A protein has these predicted regions:
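Conserved short hydrophobic interaction patches
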Residues: 72-75, 130
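GIY-YIG nuclease catalytic motif and its immediate N-terminal context
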Residues: 1-63, 67-71, 97-98, 111-118, ...
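Mixed-charge intrinsically disordered linker/loop segments at interdomain junctions
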Residues: 129-138
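Acidic, metal/cofactor-coordinating or nucleic-acid-engaging core segments within structured domains
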Residues: 74-108
Length: 141
């Protein structure tokens, strides 16, 4: 039995969103404040600038980018900040403090707004598949 698939316009939409996200201006976590991030829903990618290159570390989506990027990823505890948890679990950082300092010193965020929850999920999945970030893929429920 053949599965019904979306038309080519949908694939083009995902590709356009991917390129829009990658071409968004990267913003360093070291200069991140709540007012620098819009309080809108969207998809984001966190990269670590290592040896002059932006290495994809994490792709995510949120109903509130300001909350997710600033309050959770940068300022939040391990329960809300998956990237910090992954940095510690992998041994890249030795503690919560060290993970936060790594994010502030090395990480950058890019984001695009997207109001529709299903579309956000599709964009997140597409971007994750294309960038294959260092963290965030291996957990299954």
């Amino acid at each position: 039995m053949k599965i019904q698939t979306p038309d080519n316009q949908w694939l083009q939409y995902l590709q356009d969103a991917y390129h829009q996200l990658l071409s968004a201006a990267p913003f360093p976590f070291s200069k991140l404040t709540p007012s620098t991030i819009p309080a809108v829903s969207g998809v984001y990618v966190i990269t670590a600038k290592l040896d002059g290159k932006h290495v994809p570390y994490y792709v995510g989506r949120s109903k509130n980018l300001r909350q997710r990027l600033y309050k959770n990823h940068l300022m939040g505890p391990l329960t809300n900040a998956r990237l910090k948890k992954y940095l510690i679990k992998s041994g890249e950082c030795g503690s919560l403090h060290e993970a936060k300092e790594f994010i502030k010193a090395c990480c950058w965020a890019r984001w695009i707004g997207e109001p529709d929850i299903r579309v956000r999920g599709a964009i997140e999945g597409y971007v994750t598949g294309m960038l294959f970030p260092k963290y965030g893929i291996y957990e299954e429920h």
